[in-house]
Amino acid sequence: MSLFDWFAARRKDQFVGKVIQEAEEADGLWGKCPECSQVVYRKDLLENANVCSNCGHHNRINSDERIKLIADQNSFKSTDKHLSPVDPLGFKDRRAYADRLRESQSSTGMKDGVTTGVCQVEQIPLALAVMDFRFMGGSMGSVVGEKITRLIEKATNQKLPLLIVCASGGARMQEGMLSLMQMAKISGALERHREAELLYMPLLTHPTTGGVTASFAMLGDLILAEPKALIGFAGRRVIEQTLREKLPDNFQTAEYLLDHGFVDKIIPRTQLKKTLGVLLRLHGYREKRK
């Protein structure tokens, strides 16, 4: 083979390799970590609970994926699946609230932004609620509040520990006061759960903000968080403009809140289930007898 033919073959191989790589990326085989820009094989990412193996960045996951990570296989039994939101105010901003609901329901396959149910974690019964940020930013409307309240009441009646996975932009403005009153309703149900001397653990994921932070996200016996999760009430820019001060770079992160006593423990996603089992046993909960 002449030198010219060798270079021609090399160029062809490089071109074909580039086409194959672009095709694989288009098919969703590869992804790029938003934190460290490392190119990762999507299958490896999924097998690692959507956590980047290079930098540990926790990518956002949906409620179904979260339940699979937490609950023992085939143990999750959903509750109140029939509840669906309505548009009591006929609210419309740039778009009608009813249209936003239909779009979110179509894209997520959910009726609203939380999945509730009872499961087992390392064979220990647990009441579990998982918010899903895909559904209108995980906002808390009347159905989200009602489903969480009913789950808390079920946990109280059945003497179950409770875990709520928070991922929310706050109260759903399109429902006005009906949304805001969910804060008090859920808090009241949690107080009755506490009076029954039962364990409640919120898990704060990225992001947990607004009315959710101002209510049930901060009422736990043990407040857990994922690494680098954004946790706060008002936005950083609003606070800086109000105080006229520059805030620390890590302000409103899980690590900042841990340092200042607002969070009890930061748990990497890959260690969550094992850690939950340990915490439940430390608080006297035992495996369900067969």
Swiss-Prot record:
EC id: 2.1.3.15
Keywords per UniProt: ATP-binding, Cytoplasm, Fatty acid biosynthesis, Fatty acid metabolism, Lipid biosynthesis, Lipid metabolism, Metal-binding, Nucleotide-binding, Transferase, Zinc, Zinc-finger
Protein name: Acetyl-coenzyme A carboxylase carboxyl transferase subunit beta
Compartments where located: Cytoplasm
Zn-finger region bounds: C4-type: 33-55
Reaction(s) the record says it catalyses: N(6)-carboxybiotinyl-L-lysyl-[protein] + acetyl-CoA = N(6)-biotinyl-L-lysyl-[protein] + malonyl-CoA
A single GO BP: fatty acid biosynthetic process
Cofactor(s) in the UniProt record: Zn(2+)
Coiled-coil zones: none
Cofactor details (free text): Binds 1 zinc ion per subunit.
Gene Ontology MF terms in the entry: acetyl-CoA carboxylase activity; ATP binding; carboxyl- or carbamoyltransferase activity; zinc ion binding
